[in-house]
Regions:
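Short loop/turn and low-complexity linker motifs enriched in small/turn-promoting residues
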Residues: 24-192
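Sec-dependent bacterial lipoprotein signal peptides
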Residues: 1-24
Length: 192
């Protein structure tokens, strides 16, 4: 009885893996901008084309984990409790929103989704992150940014990954945090 060599299968698998990972190096979710470059973002205009309108950008980042390309980004879904055109969550893998907003100067409440997708087609989102009554000044640029941490919870064999997201809103030019205002009792509100 003659045994078949597994070498051709290993070589083929290695070539396919290289092709898949190499071909996905430019991965980004839907048509959203993958790399942080605010000058290339076109803000969704809610200011009636005011020349001194504040602009709010939502963070976006691409990276690799274990060789798999990921795209994590924030997408604005509501301004002042009004759903933005085309925004929302249709399913766990289908989230839409705006990456930049042009607002009228003054106080506004924002709501957004933190979205994480990868080139393998898996991912998810945590929506209804919210900041209320934030003062946006004329002519200023802001960024809604995030930090996330992950942990594995559960008994062996029944583990699940838990993701914690912390968002801030900063003046993009001075780096001053404008929300939450620390020590004031304000918090970013995760809604359910």
């Amino acid at each position: 009885m003659r045994l078949l060599s597994t070498r051709p299968f290993k070589v083929t698998a290695a070539m396919m893996l290289t092709a898949v990972l190499g071909g996905c190096s430019g991965y980004h979710y839907k048509d959203y901008q993958g790399d942080w470059a605010p000058e290339q973002m076109t803000p969704y205009d809610l200011s009636n084309n005011a020349p001194d309108a504040p602009v709010v950008y939502f963070a976006t980042v691409r990276y690799r984990d274990l060789g798999i390309p990921f795209h994590r980004l924030l997408l604005a879904t509501h301004v002042d409790d009004q759903l933005l055109e085309g925004a929302g969550r249709a399913s766990i893998l289908d989230v839409s929103g705006k990456q930049a907003l042009k607002l009228t100067p003054g106080k506004h409440s924002l709501r957004w989704c933190w979205t994480s997708m990868n080139a393998l087609g898996t991912g998810g989102a945590q929506c209804n992150q919210e900041a209320r009554d934030v003062e946006f000044k004329a002519g200023k640029r802001y960024i809604v940014d995030f930090q996330n941490s992950t942990s594995i919870v559960g008994a062996p064999g029944r583990e699940s990954m838990r993701i914690h997201i912390k968002s801030t809103i900063r003046d993009l030019d001075s780096d001053e945090v404008v929300y939450p205002v620390f020590g004031s009792g304000q918090e970013l509100i995760p809604r359910t």
